[in-house]
Amino acid sequence: MSQYKITKNKKTFTYGFDRVVPEYFMSVETEGEDVEELVGCFAPESGTSGHLLKAINKNGIVDLIPEEHLANIMLDLPF
């Protein structure tokens, strides 16, 4: 499993790829509050690369994610 964290405006976004399932995931935590699953097994959106890209864009963090990760997501490759 790969797992990365990005912080923006008091929110911590965790994203990555779970090789066991296999699918992408993303969640967000706001300073001390519960974690909200955005993409993945326990989220409203399944763990497809399209859903992960949609969540990244919706939350305005595309500029914080390494280009290598974005390229792999767009090509639907694990990273």
Predicted segments with their positions:
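Mixed-charge, Lys/Arg-enriched low-complexity segments
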Residues: 33-79
